[in-house]
Regions:
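Short, well-ordered alpha-helices that flank and scaffold nucleotide-derived cofactor binding pockets
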Residues: 20, 24, 90-93
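A short beta-strand-loop structural module common to alpha/beta enzyme folds
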Residues: 21-40
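Extreme N-terminal starter segment of soluble prokaryotic enzymes
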Residues: 3-8
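Glycine-rich SAM-binding Motif I of class I
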Residues: 16
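Class I S-adenosyl-L-methionine
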Residues: 11-12, 37-50, 57-134
Length: 134
């Protein structure tokens, strides 16, 4: 099977930067992101080869700890945060791809998903910034 026949879903992909190397290599990359696509109601195609998932990290990020004493910004809404995470996991399990990755900054999401298998900083891969990511 050629790369052009391999579907890569970029769930919550934003600008598509994460999936761009696959696009450059000729894969059929589909960026499933708002406002065009809502991952919570997205129905994936058949024969998905790989999935990159990057659900919103707002409710799980340790960076939000600095707002702990703010009357509104410090409150976490884990139910809302888990909506995208659950949608991504549903698509992953529905598609049963050859590979999949769910990315989120190191933080509180591990309470629901367990210990991460891999952590990194973007600078490990030549990017000019640090963001401890799992």
């Amino acid at each position: 099977m050629e790369n052009k026949d391999k579907i890569i879903l970029d769930l919550c992909g934003g600008t598509g930067a994460w999936s761009d190397p696959y696009k450059q290599a000729g894969y059929d990359v589909r960026n499933i992101t708002l406002p065009e696509f809502d991952v919570r109601i997205y129905i994936p195609p058949d024969n998905v080869y790989g999935i990159l998932a990057a659900p919103d990290c707002t409710e799980f990020s340790l960076a939000k700890n600095g707002w702990a004493h703010h009357p509104t910004r410090g409150k976490r809404d884990f139910v809302k945060g888990m909506e995208e995470v659950n949608a991504c996991l549903r698509i992953i399990f529905q598609c049963s791809p050859i590979f999949w990755v769910l990315e989120n900054p190191v933080g509180l999401l591990s309470r629901w998903l367990g210990k991460t298998k891999y952590t990194f900083h973007p600078w490990f891969f030549g990017e000019p910034w640090s963001k401890f990511t799992a």
